[in-house]
Amino acid sequence: MVMAFLDLYKINDCINLDAHTCFGTEESYPNFQKDLEKFKSLLVDLVSNNQSKTFYKFGDGDYYFLRADSVGSASPGRRALSKSYDQINHQDFVDGSKLCDYYTCEIYPENRSKFKEVIPKDINFPAEYGYALVANKWILQEFAGKIGLIGADIKMNIIKNLMEAPQYQEYLGLEKFEDYISLPQRFACDDLEATERMVGEQLKNSTSKIFLMGMGHVKSGLIHRLKKYTDAVFLDVGAAIDALSGIIDIERPYFGDWTNYQIDEMSLYEGVDFLAYVGKGKHILLERE
């Protein structure tokens, strides 16, 4: 854990095991607590007024994807696309990334510098807020009865199955998610139009007023288009979807105290993208009745 983790960066009811040095200096983000309250108030206002707004969470992988650099998750054949960058309309992603309403980025100085290189917009809030407000369940309980999810088909199916268990409902403080909107786990960027059709058709029948999303690099071309299909707040929370799936790396910001609930049925996890999850932290295995 960070040797000098400042109180400035503490958020109620969750623990941050992220060892980045930015959490040890006030200069990283002096208004962290003040802006956290602004962020929460903004979400409440947007949902209560049924405003349709998009939040794009930027990470270092998005930097490489938007530059068409074959690094990590942005490498063809790895996760986002099976084709080479010159075989897709990459410019649609570059242009789309600039068309969202709000932008979040971790307070890591290097990530914020990368953001400014590829997206000519202001960073509105730290991405850590999205993680923490799922980790401490605030967002789940504040918007109970209004929340849907958007993410990889395999993870949506895992969460659906987990939510059948009263024990998991109790842990989240939430009886159900209103909608599960699926997209391909791998290679969703190969055909942006096809992925949009898949997601759009599901959104047309949705009832949620706020969607928590984790959709990989396809978000750069897709997020700004979602408002065409339903009026809702679209909040990109990235790896927080993995937490709801029970497979979060607890060293991700603010998930240090998270319990990964999993189901004793291996077939549910076949082909799932575990990202950095290696089994650390607290786990509860739910048996099928």
What kind of region is each of these model predictions?
Residues 145-147, 208-211:
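Short active-site oxyanion
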Residues 168-210:
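A mid-sequence, solvent-exposed acidic-amphipathic segment
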Residues 110, 185-187, 241:
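Residue-level detector of flexible, active-site-proximal loop/helix-junction positions
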Residues 2-173:
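Electropositive, gly/pro-rich neighborhoods at or near active sites that engage anionic ligands
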Residues 218-289:
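C-terminal functional extensions of proteins
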Residues 66, 156-159, 188-190, 221, ...:
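Short acidic/glycine-rich loop or secondary-structure boundary segments that cap or lie
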